Amino acid sequence: MGKLSNIRRTKMLAQEGRCYYCGLLMWDPELKDAAPAICLAPAMQKYLRCTAEHLHPRSEGGANTSSNIVAACWYCNTRRHHRKAPPSPDVHRAHVQKRMAKGKWLAARLPSTVTVGGRASLSKESRLPC
């Protein structure tokens, strides 16, 4: 594992396995642990894969340092950078949270999403099967 992988994993653990932007549980393919039960469907595993999100993008001189990286799910990370001018992390986080509250972000793709402690999660009964 490289330095970036170690930082990503450390951040993921510090964030209790939750995406910096949407708060959904993520998984790390390099860990032996299975994807969280929040979603076992292969397509959702892609969306919820943990990535190292550079708060200050590398393309703009951002470094691979712990202070510049948070753990974010693939979906939130790619959506931030698909724009012509990616918004700041704070602006993107507010945007994601607003869309989540309206059921118009990744959580809308998951069945029976509920909010627990301000974070989206799924009830045991509504988790997708393998």
Indicate where each model-derived feature is located.
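Short, charged surface segments at domain edges that flank catalytic/cofactor-binding sites
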Residues: 1-39
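The −1 position to Zn-ligating cysteines in a subset of zinc-ribbon hairpins
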Residues: 17-18, 51, 72
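Histidine-centered nuclease catalytic patch
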Residues: 26-69, 84
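Glycine-rich, phosphate-binding/catalytic loops in enzymes
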Residues: 36-38, 89-92
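Short Fe-S-cluster ligation motifs
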Residues: 47-66, 99-126
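Short Cys/His-centered divalent metal-binding micro-motifs
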Residues: 69-91
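Glycine-rich beta-alpha-beta "Rossmann" dinucleotide-binding loop(s) and their flanking helix/strand
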Residues: 95
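N-terminal pre-domain and mature-chain start segments
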Residues: 128-130
